[in-house]
Amino acid sequence: MAGVVKKSFESPDERRTPDKTDVQVVNLGSVKAARMTLQPGWRWSECIKPIAGTESCQIHHEGMVATGHMHVRHEDGTEMEIGAGDAYVIEPGHDAWVVGSEVFVGYEFDSKAAETFARS
């Protein structure tokens, strides 16, 4: 593999489009990265839970928010809102939803999340 690799989310290797969800995945060799575009009204427990088949999201997320806001509620009782410019880590065992009328766009670079989130 080359020492420098570049791919564009405008031409993703894979695209997933569950309800109110658009996930573009690029394969950078040893790492997969994802751009998640979530529409107002998106909620994990409504849009992704039917695909995942679990009571809460069991994916470990590491990423950053480009636009919009999302509220995250973890099974351990912690809750937080993340927004544009924030970097985040979200452990497995959570629900999340878009806050307000702005589209949420987040980028994730954890290979497991990019590889499996919103996959049917």
For the regions a protein language model found, what residue spans apply to each?
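A short, N-terminal "cap"/entry segment at the start of jelly-roll beta-barrel domains
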Residues: 1-37, 45-46
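Catalytic core of non-heme Fe(II) oxygenases with the double-stranded beta-helix
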Residues: 27, 42-57
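Short beta-strand segments
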Residues: 34, 78-80, 105
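Conserved GNAT-family N-acetyltransferase fold
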Residues: 36-38, 63, 88
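Short beta-strand segments in beta-sandwich/barrel cores
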Residues: 43-44, 68-73, 96
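Glycine- and acidic-residue-biased ligand/ion/polar-headgroup-sensing regions
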Residues: 50-76
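Short acidic-glycine-tyrosine-enriched beta hairpin
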Residues: 74-93
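Ligand-binding loop in jelly-roll beta-barrel domains
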Residues: 91-117
